[in-house]
């Protein structure tokens, strides 16, 4: 593996790019249902939706599990990675979200195995195939970040960036915003990404929580929509 000064920077761009095929582009995280129900129809509505997800869900569950999985991977402690996966699965109460977390995680793992050579990735591939680990997307992303030579901070920020850009892409496809508006929102949310990451570093696995009731209901109602562009 190339351990030059540029390699981690290039890996950071690769992992956070929407071009990286992790399957997350198929997810709207409730945005589609809220848009069809006319609960989100403006730029301000979308910004609030993203901020709620960042501060009340992503930064208090997914990102927390990712950080602990990264630390476990860094010290070659796969039991810690498995525990983070188990705890995050238990915190993910909506069945469809569990299913999509597995699918996108395994899609990411498949791409990573073809891209990087690493014994942890090999072990995780075997364990997800056996069903002994869920292989949720944030957990796999954590290990891939470590394998790619990223720091804990860069891995966490790459995860947040890819999550937000994925949702902004969904908002464009749902005709809520245009491309220029998406870029403005992404820039505006930069302080939220930083705050979300910093807070997540201070949360233990057994302290994870989420509080997004309206979004949760929208995600559960998604399967009842007459037409759907997204998987959730």
Swiss-Prot record:
Q: In its keyword annotation, does this UniProt entry include Cytoplasm? A: yes
Report keywords, A-Z: Chaperone, Cytoplasm, Nickel insertion
Q: Which GO terms describe its cellular component?
A: cytoplasm
Task: Name one molecular function that GO assigns to this entry.
Answer: nickel cation binding
What domain of life does the UniProt record list for this protein's source? Bacteria
Family annotation (InterPro entries): UreF, UreF_sf
Q: Tell me where in or outside the cell this protein is found.
A: Cytoplasm
Keyword match Chaperone: yes
Purpose: Required for maturation of urease via the functional incorporation of the urease nickel metallocenter.
UniProt record similarity statement: Belongs to the UreF family.
The entry describes its oligomerization and partners as: UreD, UreF and UreG form a complex that acts as a GTP-hydrolysis-dependent molecular chaperone, activating the urease apoprotein by helping to assemble the nickel containing metallocenter of UreC. The UreE protein probably delivers the nickel.
From the Swiss-Prot or TrEMBL record, give the protein name: Urease accessory protein UreF
This protein's gene is called ureF
